[in-house]
Regions:
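Secondary-structure capping and boundary motifs in well-ordered enzyme cores
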Residues: 1, 43-44, 141
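A general alpha-helix detector
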Residues: 4-12, 50-54
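Short terminal or interdomain "cap/linker" segment that borders an active site or interface and mediates
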Residues: 4-5, 115-133, 138, 142, ...
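Long amphipathic alpha-helical segments
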Residues: 21-60
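Glycine-centered helix-coil hinge/cap
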Residues: 17-18, 71
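Amphipathic interaction/junction segments at domain boundaries or subunit interfaces
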Residues: 48-142
């Protein structure tokens, strides 16, 4: 994965848990000699996996919890790292944004030529819910997609509920997410997001 991803993990950890925690995560991840990640350098996926594994031990969270938190953080992080215009041009509403995720990755590939992006297909239903199909060469990143969806909900001020209804990790052909926009009767958390169902 590109250094941009690993830098985002680093910033998420240092922002929420401090620099000392980041240094403690680097040691079991065998990255003590690495001072920084270069945004446009492609790193082996194993580097990211080691960071997540070390973070689970240090923070006492599951890998899925960390990846979901990271997915939500990623939306804000990329907006502040110079990609706000790319995000803005992808869609003015959450449904429109989800329809154009593959276009976003195609444009991002101009700056990241070794990018191996996932593919998304969004299906809209009459009740305003959506099914988002996620396909990737990489495994284990579906929890990040859940976080991304919640991050996008916050970006568009659109409270939502997300349920993963099919999982490659459990033998399904694809990862599939049910996205339901909030109605006035749904329980809403203080930060504006909905409770997980």
């Amino acid at each position: 994965m590109y250094g941009l991803v690993n830098r985002a993990i680093q910033q998420m950890v240092t922002t929420h848990h401090g620099e000392d925690t980041w240094q403690r995560i680097k040691e079991p991840a065998d990255l003590l000699d690495l001072d920084f990640f270069s945004t446009y350098q492609a790193y082996p996926d194993d580097v990211t996996h080691r960071l997540v594994a070390a973070a689970t031990e240090e923070l006492g969270l599951s890998g899925d919890q960390i990846m979901q938190a990271f997915g939500e953080y990623w939306i804000t992080y990329t907006a502040t790292e110079g990609y706000e215009q790319l995000l803005e041009s992808t869609g003015e509403t959450l449904p429109e944004f989800l329809d154009h995720l593959d276009n976003l990755h195609a444009r991002a590939a101009l700056a990241f030529p070794e990018l191996q992006p996932p593919s998304f297909r969004c299906e809209h239903h009459a009740d305003a819910s959506m099914q988002l199909e996620y396909r990737s060469k990489r495994r284990g990143l579906a929890p990040m997609v859940t976080g991304l969806l919640h991050g996008l909900g916050k970006r568009f001020r659109t409270p939502l509920a997300v349920d993963q209804i099919a999982s490659r990790d459990q033998g399904d052909a694809t990862d599939l997410f049910q996205v339901r926009l909030a109605s006035p009767t749904d329980p809403v958390l203080p930060e504006g997001g909905m409770r997980h169902e």
